[in-house]
């Protein structure tokens, strides 16, 4: 059984950012292996924290961080022929402070390049669901993209589409924007590179997932650039937290299909008299267990990795 980690504190590694799920640390040069290439590096730790409706909940999902990290690493390696990523060939145990148990971080942490984030969320959609479905019902468009009339909830789109959104701070909500707004934010050349990479990776991943009996409805990527302007995909990749995966045998047009994510949590929270603001309520044990099982099933079906 995995050890649960709600928050990581690593003396000697400056905390750069504590997000909803991940803790990110700067790695001082003297903690790197002597043969590490020049440049700045980060240690990214996937904790077992769980967020819903942009609020971090008090109860962790045991082993969730390890499962997310393993799914991400699987996809980073699977897609490196399509797009370079932030991973580097430095082992986690090489940079951990003395006295820290390497086993606690072995499956939930990675050493990465330190990149300049592109300040836009890159979203690919292959099916009409979620906020895209709501936008379509209201306007017939998603992020300014005209779609055919008469599409139904969860319907497969004629072609995958790129629908960027703002990158909100913790506790705030992302907002869908059109491509022109993205161009104004990051410039035309970078916007086109991000759009092309997003759709290229999505198509590849959707085809692979289909072979595993899973539909990849949509997914969100984050990108960053190095000092030379090279583009990398970063943060997490095609995890149940950043993607909407549906069991193909349970897909039904006109409904919101079950997914490999925290839907059990959202459904439970919707039954409560809670204003969807911090602090979040505690979760019953059965909701935690069922959510963990969904993450574990996604890891096994996609990457062939079983957990205890």
Swiss-Prot record:
One Gene Ontology term of the molecular function aspect: ATP binding
CDD domains: SAICAR_synt_Sc
GO cellular component: cytoplasm
Pfam families: SAICAR_synt (PF01259)
GO biological process annotation, one example: 'de novo' IMP biosynthetic process
Source domain of life: Bacteria
Keywords attached to this entry: ATP-binding, Ligase, Nucleotide-binding, Purine biosynthesis
SUPFAM superfamilies: SAICAR synthase-like
Gene3D superfamilies reported in the protein's UniProt record: ATP-grasp fold, B domain, Phosphorylase Kinase, domain 1
Pathway the protein contributes to: Purine metabolism; IMP biosynthesis via de novo pathway; 5-amino-1-(5-phospho-D-ribosyl)imidazole-4-carboxamide from 5-amino-1-(5-phospho-D-ribosyl)imidazole-4-carboxylate: step 1/2
Enzyme Commission (EC) number: 6.3.2.6
Recorded catalytic activity of this chain's protein: 5-amino-1-(5-phospho-D-ribosyl)imidazole-4-carboxylate + L-aspartate + ATP = (2S)-2-[5-amino-1-(5-phospho-beta-D-ribosyl)imidazole-4-carboxamido]succinate + ADP + phosphate + 2 H(+)
Entry similarity comment: Belongs to the SAICAR synthetase family.
Protein name, as recorded: Phosphoribosylaminoimidazole-succinocarboxamide synthase
Native organism: Xanthomonas oryzae pv. oryzae (strain PXO99A)
Gene from which this protein is expressed: purC
């Amino acid at each position: 059984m995995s050890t649960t980690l709600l928050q990581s504190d690593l003396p000697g590694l400056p905390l750069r950012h504590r997000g909803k799920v991940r803790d990110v640390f700067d790695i001082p040069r003297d903690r790197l292996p002597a043969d590490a290439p020049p440049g700045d590096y980060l240690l990214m730790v996937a904790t077992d924290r769980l967020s819903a409706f942009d609020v971090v909940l008090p109860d962790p999902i045991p082993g969730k961080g390890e499962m997310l990290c393993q799914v991400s690493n699987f996809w980073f390696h699977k897609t490196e022929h399509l797009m370079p990523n932030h991973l580097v060939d430095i082992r986690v145990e090489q940079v951990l402070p003395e006295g820290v148990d390497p086993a606690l971080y072995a499956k939930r942490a990675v050493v990465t390049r330190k990149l300049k984030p592109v300040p836009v969320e890159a979203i690919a959609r292959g099916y009409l669901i979620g906020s895209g479905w709501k936008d379509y019902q209201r306007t017939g468009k998603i992020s300014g993209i005209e779609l055919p009339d008469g599409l139904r909830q969860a319907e497969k789109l004629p072609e995958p589409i790129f629908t960027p959104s703002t990158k909100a701070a913790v506790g705030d909500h992302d907002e869908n924007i059109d491509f022109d707004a993205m161009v104004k934010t990051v410039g035309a050349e970078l916007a086109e590179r991000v759009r092309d990479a997003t759709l290229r990776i999505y198509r590849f991943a959707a085809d692979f997932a289909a072979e595993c009996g899973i539909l990849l409805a949509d997914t969100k990527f984050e990108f960053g650039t190095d000092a030379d302007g090279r583009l990398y995909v970063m943060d997490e990749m095609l995890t149940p937290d950043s993607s909407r995966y549906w069991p193909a045998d349970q897909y039904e047009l006109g409904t919101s299909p079950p997914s490999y994510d925290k839907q059990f949590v959202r459904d439970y929270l919707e039954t409560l008299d809670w204003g969807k603001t911090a602090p979040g309520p505690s979760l019953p044990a059965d909701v935690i267990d069922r959510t963990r099982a969904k993450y574990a099933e996604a890891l096994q079906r996609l990457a062939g990795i079983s957990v205890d």
